[in-house]
């Protein structure tokens, strides 16, 4: 992805949702994303993150420490939206469920129910419910706050919910639009 590619995609959007880790900071294209935020203060940039608790509280420090572009800072963002502890637990800290959050959600659900239960000690129905409670947070927040695009590295888990919420999803690692439903 080039900066020109990014500008072409984001020029059609006034309100943009940004993931933090592996996107705005410590990511392959973080320099491009930071530059875009700095170059476009006229847009409404929102941070939408799975950070919660102490990680959310240290967000400003992490943005500062991982700043690549001069002028990049938390003051450029219209809003910061972190997930609740309860919803975070549903996707990332389930002790009875060892499913890696990077697994493809749709593929995991193709496992026969009895095998799924034996492997993960949780029913597919409960897994699907927990997955929705956690991973629909970003697309739902984007829709509620008027963001028409989400830039995120965790596209496998976000795709389904972005489609449901009519939010375009840009893969922050590969630079590709993952769903093409939105017509700006």
At which residue positions do the language-model features occur?
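Conserved Lys-Pro-Asp/Glu-containing loop-to-beta segment of HAD-superfamily phosphomonoesterases
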Residues: 130-155
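Active-site-proximal specificity loops/subdomain of glycosyltransferases
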Residues: 112-130
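Short, hydrophobic beta-strand segments that form beta-sheet elements in well-ordered domains
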Residues: 46-48, 148-152, 169
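Short, conserved loop/helix-junction motifs that constitute active-site signature segments
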Residues: 38-41, 142-145, 162
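Acidic, PIN/NYN-like endoribonuclease modules and their adjacent C-terminal/linker elements
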Residues: 159-184
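Alpha-helical substrate-recognition element adjacent to the catalytic core
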Residues: 1-117
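Short, charged, surface-exposed secondary-structure boundary motifs
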Residues: 85-89, 118-120, 177-184
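Short, charged/polar "capping" segments at the starts of alpha-helices
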Residues: 53-59, 156-160, 177-178
């Amino acid at each position: 992805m080039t900066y020109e590619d990014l500008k072409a995609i984001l020029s059609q959007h006034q309100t943009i949702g940004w993931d933090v880790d592996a996107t705005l900071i410590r990511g392959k294209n973080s320099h491009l994303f930071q530059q875009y935020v700095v170059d476009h203060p006229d847009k409404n940039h929102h941070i939408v993150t799975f950070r919660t608790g102490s990680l959310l509280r240290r967000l400003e420090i992490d943005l500062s420490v991982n700043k690549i572009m001069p002028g990049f800072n938390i003051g450029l963002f219209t809003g910061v939206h972190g997930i609740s502890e309860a919803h975070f637990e549903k996707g990332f800290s389930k002790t009875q469920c060892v499913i890696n959050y990077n697994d493809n959600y749709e593929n995991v659900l193709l496992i026969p129910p009895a095998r799924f239960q034996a492997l993960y000690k949780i029913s597919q129905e409960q897994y699907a419910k927990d997955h929705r409670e956690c991973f629909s947070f970003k697309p739902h927040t984007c829709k509620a706050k008027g963001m028409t695009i989400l830039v995120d590295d965790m596209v496998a888990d976000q795709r389904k919910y972005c489609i449901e919420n009519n939010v375009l999803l840009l893969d922050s690692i590969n630079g590709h639009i993952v769903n093409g439903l939105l017509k700006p």
